[in-house]
Design a protein with these regions (language model features):
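Short, structured beta-strand/loop micro-motifs enriched in basic residues and often containing a Trp
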Residues: 85-92, 118
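Intrinsically disordered, Ser/Thr/Pro/Gly-rich linkers and terminal tails that flank
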Residues: 1-79, 83, 103, 110-111, ...
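Cleft-lining beta-strand/loop regions that shape enzyme active-site pockets
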Residues: 89-90, 98-100, 112, 122-290, ...
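Conserved P-loop NTPase
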Residues: 294-298, 305-338
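Hydrophobic beta-strand signal
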Residues: 109-110, 306
Length: 359
């Protein structure tokens, strides 16, 4: 069958294909699925790994993820455009994924026998989730080796902010994402360490894939001087918005940040703000390079559109997207370390360097 070309706008193009479907398609036409597929395909045509359509049915799960509470296996995922695969950015500490040995950089090939590409990330994410106690099978590509995992889903609470006092009265705080309440937990943990007499602070942002931007801004506000620039946000019309520290700092001591290639998004906002304002030195390796901000638009039918709407620049107007932030002191972990989430302190050359600089 030959179809004549008629390259018009999207509405006329869809109408053309609808007529062909109505005329020739043998099976049952599910109008809702057809509409949803058209929307997803349209948005995927933007070729942006962070912009996605969220169906009405998936919105509750999305909002639960944003607050740090959900049922699943506990991984942060990103679209890997080079391989067109879904990549594990990092597993959540203590989660089924971490316990099973899933690592940052692992590529997800299939979930319960169904293969997925980067464009299918939201579908795969929903497939991975389910009722607590049920299992999910995943096929993972690690380098050239394929591995299979069977994991039991659990109720996941993203780890709270953790902290301790190291040698020489050095405080140490780490957290794996910026979720609802992270800034308040960070402040409480710092005050707890301050009561124990810390004189300097190490903030570990390694494997922190980001999260809620406002939480990162609030933590920056605890450290920067009032009116210091935190970041610049630039929209599609080159209209610029400046985010500045609104209060006097509550943290006034030497700070070292730890970063690696899995430090992304909101973590990079915090790292860039503290580095450019001279409030912290960065130790580790270059960060991931996600320097764009998404906003969630809720539509009248209950569905949503998470859309990349702004690029951010550090206070020195340094571009981060697809570039990353260079550390002040580049320190790589030894080759003997195979799992960046489980590094023995004796092997943690990055932490050792941070301690040396914080003394």
């Amino acid at each position: 069958i030959s179809i004549s070309e008629n390259n018009g706008d999207i509405t006329s193009e869809l109408s053309k294909y609808r007529r062909l479907i109505d005329k020739y398609f043998l099976g049952y036409i599910d109008e809702e699925k057809l509409k949803e597929g058209a929307i997803k395909g349209y948005i995927e045509g933007l070729d942006d790994p962070y912009t996605e359509y969220i169906s009405k049915e998936d919105m509750d799960d999305y909002m639960a993820d944003a607050t740090g509470n959900f049922v699943g296996i506990g991984i942060y995922m990103v679209k890997n455009t080079e391989s067109n695969k879904i990549m594990v950015l990092s597993p959540i500490k203590g989660s089924p994924a971490e316990k099973a040995g899933i690592l940052p950089g692992d590529l997800i090939i299939s979930v319960d026998g169904v293969s997925y590409t980067a464009e299918d990330m939201s579908v795969a994410s929903n497939k991975i989730k389910g009722e607590a106690g049920t299992t999910v099978k995943m096929e993972i590509l690690r380098g050239t080796e394929t591995k299979e995992f069977e994991l039991k889903r659990e109720s996941i609470k993203v780890n709270p902010v953790e902290g301790k006092v190291l040698q020489n009265n050095i405080g140490y705080i780490e957290f794996s994402s910026f979720d609802e309440g992270t800034a308040d937990e960070f402040k409480a943990k710092f005050e707890e360490l301050q009561r124990q007499g810390i004189k300097s602070l190490i903030i570990d942002l390694r494997n922190n894939g980001g999260g809620i931007v406002d939480e990162a801004l609030q933590i920056a506000d605890y450290i920067l001087n009032k009116d210091d620039v935190i970041l610049y946000e630039v929209d599609k019309n080159n209209k610029e918005k400046v985010e500045k520290a609104e209060k006097d700092p509550i943290i006034d001591m030497p700070i070292i940040l730890l970063t690696n290639e899995n430090t992304a998004s909101s973590s990079e906002i915090l790292a860039g703000a503290l580095k450019d304002n001279g409030k912290a030195k960065i130790v580790g390796t270059k960060t991931y390079g996600k320097g764009v901000i998404q906003q969630l638009l809720t539509l009248p039918d209950g569905s949503g559109l998470k859309i990349t709407s702004e690029e951010y620049l550090t206070p020195n107007r340094t571009k981060i997207n697809k570039v990353g932030i260079e550390p002040d002191e580049e320190v790589k972990l030894p080759d003997s370390v195979k799992n960046v989430l489980k590094v023995e302190e004796k092997d943690d050359t990055q932490l050792q360097k941070a301690i040396e600089m914080a003394k």
